[in-house]
C-alpha cells in the first residue's frame, strides 16, 4: 500500500465514522496498520470506532497505543477522556483524573476555553471523590489563569465563592491543609466583594468566622471578629462569637469582660452575653447571681460546654449538688458532638462531676464518681484524681482500696493537702479521732482556705470527747472558720446551733444558726425542726409558722412530714381542729406508721366533733403501738359517747389490766 493509498484509507475510515459505519472504519484502519503499524491516526480511529461498538477494552488499548506513539498529540487524549466519561465505565476515576491533567497541560498554551472546561470537569471529579486538597489546588490554578487574562474583580469574587462552596464540606475532616486553603478562599472573597458593607458581604463574613471557630484559629478569629465589628457596628453576631470564644478558652481577661459588657449593652437578651456576665459573677464569688445568669444564658445558647461547666461549679459552691451533676452531664453531652470536642474541658467536667458526687456521699453516687474518674485521660497518674478516687472508695465502703490510695499518696505527695485530708476522712469514719485530728491539721496547714477541712476538724472535736466538744477553742472555732470560708455550708451552721443550744445555752443564737442552716439546705430536717422548736420556746410563733408555711407550700405529697406534724400540732394547741386534721393527714401520707401522729389526728377529729373518725384514729394508734394507753382510753371514752357501752366497758377493763391505777379509766 502506497503512501497515497494509506491517506485514502484513513479518509475512508473518517467518513465511515462520520456515517456511523464503525465496523467499516475498523476494516480501513486495520488495512492501514498492516502497512504502517505505528500510524497514529489509525490507532485513534480504532479507538473511536471500538468505543462506539461498545468494545471499551479494545478502544482503551488503541488510544494508549496512539498516546505511546505521540504523547503530546491531543486526539488520543481527548478520545480516552470521552471513553472514560461514558456511564458504563467504572473504576476509572483515577485514570480519568490523569487524562484531564494531561489535557490541561496540552490546552494551557492554546485553547483557553477548553482548558477551563477540562479544569471544571477535573474539579468536579475530585469533589465527588472528596479529594479536597486537589479540589482547592486545581481551582486555584483556574483562578490564577483568569487573573493572568485580566478577569474582572466581580468574576474573581464569584470564583472564590465557588471555591468556598466546593470546600465547605471539608471542615468535617478537620484536615489542616484543606482548612487553610478554605480560609484563604474566604479572605480573597471578602476582599474582592463589590458592595462593602452589604448583605452578601455580611453573610460571607459570618460564614468565615464560623469556619475559623471550627478550625480553632484563635488569632485569625479574634482579628476577623474585630474587623467585622468595625464594618457592622450594630450587628451582634461577631461579638457573640468572640464572647463564646473567650468563654470556651477559659480566660477572663479585661478584653473578655469588655466584650461581655458591650454585648449586653447591644442586646440585653444575648445568650453569650448573659453567660459571660454569669462567669464574671462566679469569679467574683457571687454564686447565686452566677447560677441565675448562667442558667438564663444557657436557655438561649445550649451548645456551650464551658458554660455548663461553670454553671456546675457555681451550683456546687451553693451546695446544689444534684443540679450540679446534671449540669456536668450537659457539659459532657455538648463535648460529645464533633463541634464541641475538647479533651481538656472533658477531663475538667469529669473531675468536677466526681467531686460533686463525692459530696452527695451515698454509695450509688460514689459508684458514679468512680466511673467518671475512670474516663479522665491520664487520671491514674494525677494525684488530685487519685485523692478523689480514694474518697469515692471510702463513700462506697471500700476501706482497703481507700487506705491503699491514701498511703501511696502520702508517700509520693506528702505536701498535697488532699492526701492528708483523705487520711483524715478514713480515720474519722473509723472513729479514730486523735489520728483524724492530726490528719486534718496537716491538711489545713497546706490548704487553710478549705472550709470542708475545718468542718471535719470541728466534727472530730465534737465527737472526740466532752472536753473537746465544750472547748471554745476546739469545735466552736473550727465550725466558725468553716462557716466563714463557705457561707453556704449549712452543716457548719447546724453544728454551731448544736453548740449554742447544748453547750452555751444561748437559745437565741442557736435559733439563728439553725434558721440559717435550714435556709441554705431545705432538706435538713434537723435544722428546720430545731429552728421551729426554739422559735416556739422563745415565744416567736410568727417565725415558727413562717418556716413551716414555707416548707409545706413547696412540699410534694408524701414529703416534709416534720413540717406538717409541727404545724398540725400548733393548730391543735390553738383550737383550729380542721386545719390540724389537714396537716396531720399530710404528715401521715409521709409516714403512715407513726402512732403518735395517729393519736394527734384522733385528738383533732375529736375537737372537731367527728367522733367516729376520731375513734378510728385512736384505734389505729393503739394497733401500731399497744403501749399508747392514752389512745386506748380515748377510744373507750368515744365508744361511751357514741353509746357503745359494752365496748367501752371492755376497753376500760383492758386498760386497768395493764395500768391498775389509771384514773381516767377508773372514772370511765
What are these regions (language model features)?
Residues 14, 48, 82, 124, ...:
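Residue-level recognition of tetratricopeptide repeat
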Residues 35, 69, 106-110, 145, ...:
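Structural marker of alpha-solenoid helical repeat scaffolds
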Residues 25, 59, 96, 135, ...:
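Single-residue signature of alpha-solenoid repeat helices
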